[in-house]
Every structure is written in structure tokens, then in C-alpha cells.
Amino acid sequence: MERHQHLLSEYQQILTLSEQMLMLATVENWDALVDLEMAYLKAVENTANITISSCSSPVLQELLRQKLRSILENEIEIKRLLQRRLDKLSELVGQSTRQQAVNRTYGQFPDQALLLGETQ
């Protein structure tokens, strides 16, 4: 029984961390998300050797299935939010690169008073 309780506790810890990571991704707190991801990966690693099939209790197996389902749903949503952030960063890098090219081009003309993006 104690082993079952320990197993359930391990999965609950992973689920809690997963929910916290989802909340951080939702509010776009990327630095905190990366920091928390290390704890999440460690918790997953700690439970890697324990499998649902090794549990004899059908009730415990169902509880763990529910937790795993929730964890996987959180993972999918976190990945979606991270992809959206990556797309935004790629767009910003592209804009910056184009702006630098324009500024270099216009900067070659000595009679040009202002570079694009500068104010008088």
C-alpha cells in the first residue's frame, strides 16, 4: 500500500509541475517556465522506472491513467504556446534583419540625414 501511495504521489507531483508550467506558458513567463522545466524533468526521471502495469490495484491504475492523461494534455498545450512564441520571435528576428539591411543601404549615402527608424 505504501508503494502505491508513493507512486501516486510521484505522479501527482508531475501533474502539479505540469499545471504550473502551463500557467507560466499561458502568461508568457518564459524564464520561469524554463527554470521549472528542470524540476519537471527531474520528477519525470524519478518515476521513469515505475510503470502502471506493475501496479496490481485497478483503482490505482485508473488514478494514474487520469493523471497521465492530464499531464499529456498539458504537454500538448505548452508545446502549442511555445510554438506560438517561437513563431513570434522568428518574425521579430526577420523584421530586425530587414531593418538592418535598409539602414545599411541608406547609411551608404553621405547626404542622407536620417536612417530609417530614427527621429529628427
Swiss-Prot record:
GO CC annotation terms, alphabetical = cytosol
- Specify where the region named Required for homodimerization lies, as residue ranges: 1-50
The cellular location(s) given in this protein's UniProt record come to:
Cytoplasm, Cytosol
- Keyword Lipid biosynthesis applies: no
The record's InterPro entries line, in alphabetical order, gives: FliT
Which UniProt keywords are present, listed alphabetically?
A: Bacterial flagellum biogenesis, Chaperone, Cytoplasm, Repressor, Transcription, Transcription regulation
Name where it mostly resides: cytoplasm
Q: Does the keyword Repressor apply?
A: yes
* GO BP annotations, alphabetical order: bacterial-type flagellum organization; negative regulation of bacterial-type flagellum assembly; protein folding
Question: Which residue intervals make up region (FliD binding)?
Answer: 60-98
Described function: Dual-function protein that regulates the transcription of class 2 flagellar operons and that also acts as an export chaperone for the filament-capping protein FliD. As a transcriptional regulator, acts as an anti-FlhDC factor; it directly binds FlhC, thus inhibiting the binding of the FlhC/FlhD complex to class 2 promoters, resulting in decreased expression of class 2 flagellar operons. As a chaperone, effects FliD transition to the membrane by preventing its premature polymerization, and by directing it to the export apparatus.
Self-association or partners: how does it assemble? Homodimer. Interacts with FliD and FlhC.
Similarity section: Belongs to the FliT family.
* The protein's name in its UniProt record: Flagellar protein FliT
Q: Which organism is it from?
A: Yersinia pseudotuberculosis serotype O:1b (strain IP 31758)
